[in-house]
Design a protein with these regions (language model features):
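Glycine-rich nucleotide/cofactor/substrate-binding loop typically near the N-terminus or early
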Residues: 37-107, 200
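N-terminal glycine-/serine-/threonine-rich phosphate-binding loop
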Residues: 1-55
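Short beta-strand segments
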Residues: 11, 78, 101-106, 146-147, ...
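Short coil/turn connectors at secondary-structure junctions
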Residues: 4-7, 27-30, 45-48, 70-74, ...
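Short acidic, glycine/serine/threonine-rich loops at helix termini
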Residues: 20-22, 43-47, 60-64, 89, ...
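A short, charged helix-loop
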Residues: 100-123, 127-169, 220, 225-231
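Active-site loops and adjacent core secondary-structure elements that bind or stabilize anionic groups
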Residues: 150-158, 163-266
């Protein structure tokens, strides 16, 4: 079923690429609701934007740890438009329905990679943003969720082509992407806290390395993980699945030696 976007909640860490979407949403008459730095960014572009604390009647608190975690926000996201009791409670509690959520999470992995202190790393564990992603994705029948800057260009094209309207298939697609983002984010946090104990294996990636082909040339292949972190390809074609098998054999071979060693496989 087609849905019209009338109100958007926007809370992003990085602002790059957002201006074009805001311009198109504003042209379509969409109302903006936002928090902190994102609110300042939106108003600096000359657009009217309602602050989240105007809706919640609570200020941002605990050093910004609590901003959007409130029934006035999540009620407006999770309310099922075709559910009689939900509609009744929306009216009873004056919940502002939210049709679009745009989130860009705190850069947890980048903070870890920068060598930051644990205090700084912990503060980059996003709570409100990840909750907004999950809430909006759960209610994809009524709500659009844009959960990554990587989705901005595609969503902007959609807005230009069909206005502030989305199909159920489009909303379901973005929900799928949202759960991919949230699972990758939580996997990164788990790996940090696992501290090398390897009590479990968690791997999630929204950008796997595309291989030249799978085990056979007619098959597709993907590598999930950070290949470039451990290996430098000096020359030749793109890596295939069989190349990875050779690399694994070479690594297993040289790991038997404590002195610097190299292996040649053909």
């Amino acid at each position: 079923m087609e849905k019209v976007i009338r109100r958007a909640l926007i809370s992003v860490y990085h602002k790059e690429g957002l201006a074009e979407i805001l311009a198109e949403l504003n042209r379509q008459g969409v109302e903006f609701v936002s928090t902190g730095g994102t609110h300042e960014f939106i108003t600096s572009l000359g657009y009217a934007c309602r602050a989240v604390d105007d809706l919640t009647r609570y200020p941002s608190m605990l050093g910004g740890r609590v901003k959007t975690l409130h029934p006035m926000i999540f009620g407006g996201i999770l309310a099922r438009r075709g559910h009689e009791s939900d509609v009744r409670e929306v009216g009873e509690y004056g919940l502002p329905l939210i049709d679009l959520v745009i989130v860009d999470l705190y850069p947890f992995e980048a903070t870890v990679a920068s060598g930051a202190s644990e205090e700084d790393i912990i503060e980059k564990i996003d709570i409100g943003g990840i909750s907004l992603i999950r809430g909006a994705a759960k209610n994809f029948e009524d709500v659009v969720i844009i959960s990554s800057r990587a989705q901005y260009a595609g969503f902007y094209s959609l807005l230009k082509e069909q206005g502030a309207r989305t199909s159920l298939a489009e909303r379901r697609h973005y929900a799928r992407e949202a759960f991919a983002v949230s699972s990758a984010y939580d996997s990164a946090i788990f790996r940090y806290f696992d501290d090398g104990e390897q009590t479990a294996f968690r791997m999630s990636s929204d950008s796997p390395k595309v291989l030249r082909y799978g085990e056979n040339p007619h098959q597709r292949g993907f590598f999930f993980g950070n290949f470039d972190r451990y290996f430098d390809k000096l020359q030749g074609k793109e890596i295939s699945y069989n190349n990875l098998q050779d690399i694994e054999a070479a690594v297993s071979l040289i790991s038997e030696f404590s002195a610097p060693t190299f292996a040649i496989l053909k």
